Amino acid sequence: MSGSTLGKLFCVTVFGESHGPAIGCVVDGCPPGMTLGESDIQHDLDRRKPGTSRHVTQRRESDTAEILSGVYEGRTTGTPIALLIRNEDQRSKDYGNIAATFRPGHADYTYTQKYGFRDPRGGGRSSARLTAPIVGAGAIAKKWLKEKYGIVIRGYMSALGPLDIPFESWDEVDNNAFFSPNAAIVPELEQYMDALRKSGDSVGARVSVVAENVPPGWGEPLYDKLDADLAHALMGLNAVKGVEIGDGMQAARQLGTEHRDEITPAGFLSNHAGGVLGGISSGQAIVAHVAIKPTSSMRLPGRSVDLDGQPIEVVTHGRHDPCVGIRATPIVEALTAIVLMDHALRHRAQCGDVASGVPIVPARLD
C-alpha cells in the first residue's frame, strides 16, 4: 500500500505536497461527542509553523486549519474528520536548478528510483510541510486522551547538535524558539545557530517526549507492541534516523540491577524502560527520544549526479531550516498522541472489561 495512513482504529491519512494548493488529512475513528473546533487544533499548528524565528525557514504560512467534515455543532460525529491547510507562500522557482539533479542526503534520488519521477518543488511529498496536518490530527488525539484519561503529552529539545540541553522545567519549553526546557542555555543555542546560519551549514538535534498518566495495559504483543508502534510512527517523521524508548541504547551498557525498574507498593523506583514492559504500558510515563539528522538542503556545494548519471555540483537555494529539529517538538508530541489514542481504542475493544485484580502500582515514588 502507499504508506500514507497511520493507525488501525484511530487512523490518520495524510495528503498533499509542499507546493501544491493545500495539504491535509482525514482522521477516522474519533469517537462521537467530543467538543472540537478549529481553535483546539490551531494552538499546536502555531507552535510548529514556519517563520516564527530567525533560526527556522522564513517561508510564511499561516497554517490555518479548516475542519471540512466530522464535526457538527461543535461536537465530533464519529465520522471521518477532514482537515485542510492551504499553502500560501510557495516559491517553486527556487527549485528550478535542482529539478534535474539530486541533493545528496535527500529523498530526491530515492523518490525518483521508486516512482520514476518526482515533484522537485520544495521536496514535494517528502517535505516536512506534510507534518502540519499530522500536528492537527495529533491535537485531536491529545484532547481526547486528556479528557478521557487525563493523559498529558509534552515534548522538548534535549540536544542541538553538540550542545546537550539539561532538563530544568516544563514551564520554559514554550518560552523560546527552541522548545528548550532550560532558559539558561538559550543564549548559547542562539549564538550557535547564528554562527551556523552564517556558515551555510546545517545541524541535527534530539527531541524528547513524555506522556504521563497512561494507564497500564496498552499495547498489542507481539508485533503491535506499544513501543514498536511508537517507534514506527516516530521513524515516519522527516529526517528522523533513530528512536529510543526510555534509556534506549544506553541499556546495552547497563547491568540488570541498574536497568530493572524495581517495584514497591508505594511506586516504581525508576523508569529506565520508558514506561513500556513487554510491549505493554506499565502505568509509568512513556518516554521516547528521536535523533534528527541535519537537513541536506544547504547553500554549501556538494557532489551529486544529474538525471543522466553524470557528475554535478549541487547548491540548494530557497528557504530551508538549518536545523529541522527546532520545529519538531509539536510533531513528536502529535505522533505520540496518535499512537496512544489508537492503542487506547484497541485496548478498549479487546480488553475493556478485563479486571486484573492486581493493585495498580503508582508510576513513581512521590
Curated annotation (Swiss-Prot):
One Pfam match = Chorismate_synt
> Tell me, how does this one assemble?
Homotetramer.
Q: Which GO terms describe its cellular component?
A: cytosol
The record's keywords, sorted A to Z, are: Amino-acid biosynthesis, Aromatic amino acid biosynthesis, FAD, Flavoprotein, FMN, Lyase, NADP
Identification of the protein by name: Chorismate synthase
Lineage from the top down?
A: Bacteria, Pseudomonadati, Pseudomonadota, Betaproteobacteria, Nitrosomonadales
Which cofactors?
Answer: FMNH2
Q: In which pathway does it act?
A: Metabolic intermediate biosynthesis; chorismate biosynthesis; chorismate from D-erythrose 4-phosphate and phosphoenolpyruvate: step 7/7
Q: Which PANTHER family match?
A: CHORISMATE SYNTHASE
Signal as UniProt keyword: no
Q: Its family?
A: Belongs to the chorismate synthase family.
Q: Report the gene name.
A: aroC
- In UniProt terms, what function does this protein have? This reaction introduces a second double bond into the aromatic ring system.
- Please give a single GO biological process term from the UniProt record: amino acid biosynthetic process
Q: What is its EC number?
A: 4.2.3.5
Q: What is this enzyme's catalytic activity, as reactions?
A: 5-O-(1-carboxyvinyl)-3-phosphoshikimate = chorismate + phosphate
Residues annotated as binding FMN: R125, S126, S127, N238, A239, G278, K293, P294, T295, S296, S297, R319
Q: Which residues bind NADP(+)?
A: R48, R54
Cofactor detail note: Reduced FMN (FMNH(2)).
| Single Gene Ontology MF annotation | FMN binding
InterPro entries, sorted: Chorismate_synth, Chorismate_synth_AroC_sf, Chorismate_synthase_CS
